[in-house]
Amino acid sequence: STGLLTRGSRVRTPSDPPLSSPIFGDEFGLISGFNTNYLMLTLICQCLHAQSRWLTQMSKDIWISDILAGKYDGSEVELKGWIYRSRGSNKIRFIVVRDSTGNIQCVAKRDVLGDVFFDELKSSLIESSVILKGLVQPTDREHGHELQVSSGEVVGSVNPERPFPITESAMAEADGGETEFLLDNRHLYLRTSRMTTMLKIRSSVFGAVHSYFRDLDFIEYQAPNFVAGAVEGGSTLFEVPYFGRKAYLTQSWQLYAEAAMPALERLYTIAPSFRAEKSRTRRHLTEFWHAEMEIAWASNNEVMKHGEGLVRHIAGTLLEERSDELSSLGRDLNLISQYADTPY
C-alpha cells in the first residue's frame, strides 16, 4: 500500500520497516511497537469523544416553562438561554433569562460564583447567551420561581460597541409610528416577546389546518412557485427572469390542484402566494400564506361546510393551545370562542 501512510515527514515506501516499528525513530522510544493504524484510531476516538462532550454540553433538556410549572422545585438544573434583563449591585445580580418558552429570574452572588465569573455576568449585555447551573426555588415573585446560580458560563457575549437595539424605549417609539426601525431590525425584533408570541400563534394556526384536513383523509399536495401564466389575473403577476424565458411567482395553487384532483380527489395545501398589489391596506399583501383545498364530487354546501369546519377547528385549537398568548396580545377570547361553534 505505497503512498497511503507517512513515516516521519516522508511518504512510506515498500522498503520501509514494518508498520509495527517505531514511527518517529528510536530517539523517541515512547510509542515503540505501536501500529500506525492503532495510533490513528486512538486519535480519532479522542476527537470523537471531545466532540461528543461538546455536543452533550450544548444539548438542552431543561425548559423554563417546565421550571415555572414546578417540575424542578428543589432540584439542581442546568439552564440554557439568553439574558433578557439584568440589574443589581457589585455583590448580587438579578438576571432574567429567557428561552423560547418563558422568562425566569436568576440570582447570582459574588461570594458564591467568585470574582471572575460574577464580573463576567455583570458585564454581559442583553441577549448574551449563557449556561447557568443552580437550585430552583419557589418564590412569591411574579413568575413564582427563581434560580439560585451556583456556576455556569457565558457562551456568547454581545459586543458592547453594538448592543441589542430593541429596547423598551425603542418599542414605545415604534408603537408611536416608528415602524421603520423595527423593520430595519427585523432579525432582532423576532427575539422580542411580542414577536415570539405571534409566531407561536401562527404555528398553532398552521398545525390546526394540517390536522383538520388530515383527520378527514385529505392529501397534502405541493405545487411549484414558478409558473408560466396567471391564475388570478395578469395585472398582479410578479415576473421573474428564468434562464432566458419569462416565469412568474404563483398567485395560487388552484390550477395545479385542479389537475391533480382526478387523481387524489381530496387535497389541500398551505403555501405562499405572491401578488403584485400595492399595499393600500393590510389586506393588500405582496406575499402571504394560503390555505387551499380542492374536492372532487362535492356540492356547494359541502364546500361551505369545510370552510366553516376549518375556521371552527382553528379557533378551538387556539383557545386550547394559545389562550395565554392571545390574552397577552389583548385579544378577546370570548370573541374567538364564538367561532369555535358552527354554524356562526
Question: What does each model-identified segment do?
Answer:
Residues 4, 8, 27-29:
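Short N-terminal alpha-helical targeting/association segments
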Residues 45-47:
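Cysteine-centered motifs
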